[in-house]
Amino acid sequence: VTEKGGHISEQRRASGNYGVFSARYGNIYTPSQLLQLYQEAYGERIPAERAWSRADGKFVDPYRQQIQPEGFNSVDDLMEDRLAHLKAVRHLFENVDVFVFTLGLTEAWRSREDGSIFSAAPGVVGGSYDSSRYGFVNFSVEQTFEALNKFLIRFHAINPGAKVLLTVSPVPLIATYEPRSVLVSTTYSKSVLRVAAEMALNKFPWVDYFPSYEI
């Protein structure tokens, strides 16, 4: 755990999700999110959007929307926290022995400006939805594996001794943006993610799979 929050009170650590994740990123549902996190951490990309405002005047990190429930007091505070987070992410990637990643979703919301993937739809936790700026995407097998493959190649380059353990989330979707039953969308999503994981397993000898979905 790279972000333990030892510099703040125990109460704030609990409310701010410190020590919950290996780094304080919240839920990363898609390989595209994981890839863009890596790219930002290592200077390969600079997101067009830095902060979203809330109705209470606080600010939300668009890429970690629920990591700080009380919100940030200013954009500067948010960016200071994000830079510390990215430093922790780099430390994690470079020093971990086994990196476990659960593939969770194929549905996501994406910026039309720079292709950024968000952890939740704009307007749900912060910001506001504008169809000219954001769009829904439901990733295919090809798109899912492409992002996963790009991340794995980059990760292995900086930490060649590390292993990767992939899983597919067993949790079914509770809602879908597709105009169909959520049962159908769940089956599609799990199928895509499972195939992408198998493709990675077959390509990289240092990648393994744990059958959490199957169990």
Question: What are these model-predicted stretches?
Answer:
Residues V1-I215:
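Extracellular glycan-modifying ectodomains
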